Amino acid sequence: MAVQQNKKSKSKKGMRRSHDRVAVPTIVYCACGEPTVPHRACPSCGTYKGRQVVAQPNE
């Protein structure tokens, strides 16, 4: 196992970790008004790009 030869400073450690954050998901609103994730079919109405792609059970 590798062992470091010199101590990494707080600055160098912070610079290395600068990209480790969790990305905030982008939220868009469907034509039905429900929030959804981009490039996915709407879970509430089943539409994608204005077309019905997921069959919804009759209510």
From Swiss-Prot:
GO terms for cellular component: large ribosomal subunit. Keywords: Ribonucleoprotein, Ribosomal protein. Coiled coil: none annotated. One of its GO terms (molecular function) is structural constituent of ribosome. The keyword Acetylation does not apply. Residues 1-20 are annotated as: Disordered. Pfam families: Ribosomal_L32p (PF01783). Residues 7-19 have a biased composition (Basic residues). GO terms for biological process: translation. Belongs to the bacterial ribosomal protein bL32 family. This is Large ribosomal subunit protein bL32. It comes from Nitratidesulfovibrio vulgaris (strain DSM 19637 / Miyazaki F) (Desulfovibrio vulgaris).
